[in-house]
A protein has these predicted regions:
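Short active-site oxyanion
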Residues: 64-68, 109-111
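Membrane-proximal, lumen/periplasm-facing interface regions of secretory-pathway glyco-
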Residues: 2-64, 74-77, 81-87, 94-96, ...
Length: 169
């Protein structure tokens, strides 16, 4: 009788604890990879590097981003935690409780967008795709085919559009 809960724990362990080597996570069923909190952290350094590369490219082109807007709290966390060495602009998100932080004093002139082009495009004159990010090791997680883009020409200030950017999906 006691073996059943233990067996259940062992089956679910790879979803919540880093017991599978990162290079082998791709061997799990894709549904398990997408549900795994552990799999969602795979690729954080690479995502931050990819966003920083687009930030630098836009700056070289005379369009330095004035803020970064993400579609989900995971991207916001990765950029906040690992992005300080890149001197990135303020990172904003309308996802879950990130929305409550508000835009602060961040400018909306040129917004580097991570996983939220569709969400921001109604509020800007121009939005375009710059790159598509995929996590390393063929892992299928929430960051698979993640779009990185840029939006310019805001139709209103952050404080005006902010109430419309909140989402809990």
């Amino acid at each position: 009788m006691a073996a059943a809960p233990l067996a259940g724990c062992l089956v679910l362990m790879p979803l919540y604890l880093p017991v599978v080597p990162v290079t082998d996570v791709h061997s799990l069923p894709s549904s398990a990879q997408r549900l795994s909190n552990v799999a969602d952290t795979i690729g954080w350094p690479q995502l931050v590097s990819a966003v920083a590369a687009q930030d630098a490219a836009l700056a070289r082109a005379g369009q330095p981003p004035t803020s970064i807007f993400t579609g989900a709290y995971g991207e916001t966390g990765a950029l906040d935690v690992l992005g300080s060495g890149y001197r990135l602009p303020p990172v904003l998100s309308g996802h879950n409780t990130c929305w409550m932080w508000g835009p602060g004093q961040a400018s909306d002139r040129t917004v580097l967008v991570v996983d939220a082009l569709g969400q921001l495009s109604p509020y800007f004159a121009s939005c375009r795709l710059l790159a598509t990010f995929n996590p390393p090791y063929h892992v299928q997680n929430d960051w698979t085919d993640l779009q990185i883009g840029v939006c310019t020409g805001p139709v209103a200030r952050w404080n005006v559009i902010w109430p419309y950017l909140r989402h809990y999906d």
